[in-house]
Amino acid sequence: MAKPPVMGLVKTRLAASVGDESALRIYRELLEFTFSQAVESGIKTSVYFSELDQFVDDFALFEKHIQTGDDLGQRILNSFSNELQDADACLMIGADCPDLSVDTLQQAEKALEKSDLVLGPSDDGGYYLIGLKKSDPALFKNVAWSTETVMGNTMDNAIGLGMKTVLLPQLYDIDDFQDLKRSRFLAFAAESVNNDLMNL
């Protein structure tokens, strides 16, 4: 699931520190990195964009869809429901986790064979990956989206539903300037942001 790479639409918290142009450049690199990991994993991949515009044509390799729903939970649920019409299982990832790897995706795919739910927790209280074999609206009820309780709320729901759950290693997303500084070893971060700013 991703937003199209449009200036002013993506990484707004990061843009407050580095500017819209740098934030867009970093986001595009994150998007392309995420896509590359998905391709190398060998897992069939579709992209659900928050909206469609001419920029998504740059990613012709993937089947593209539009996200539908009033909040993030509904958009995730609807995307799962659509994919699981033709698949036995589905992994859903965002596009801002710089440490996402082929191994992580393949580990999640394998774990889902013997579980109901796979979650990759992020250190901000959310998750960078969720995997399901069945789309259940109850899993996404009463979740305070975009807060530090998303992971906890989801786990509470999973326990209540009796879902066998596997947790992947915790990773982090790039949402703001402090997150970006943690990933300065990545080429796109060093090239996209003024070195003086990175030293703050």
Summary of predicted features, one role per range:
Residues 1-13:
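N-terminal nucleotide-binding beta1-loop-alpha1 segment
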Residues 13-21, 64-65:
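Short glycine-enriched, charge-decorated loop/helix-capping segments at active-site entrances
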Residues 25-43:
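A short, N-terminal amphipathic alpha-helix
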Residues 42-63:
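Acidic donor-binding segment of Leloir-type glycosyltransferases
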Residues 57-91, 147-150:
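Short phosphate-binding loop-to-helix
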Residues 100-125:
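Conserved donor-nucleotide/metal-binding helix-loop-beta segment in metal-dependent transferases, i.e.
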Residues 136-157:
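Short, glycine-/small-residue-rich phosphate/pyrophosphate-handling segment
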Residues 153-200:
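Conserved alpha/beta core of the MobA/IspD/sugar-nucleotide pyrophosphorylase nucleotidyltransferase superfamily
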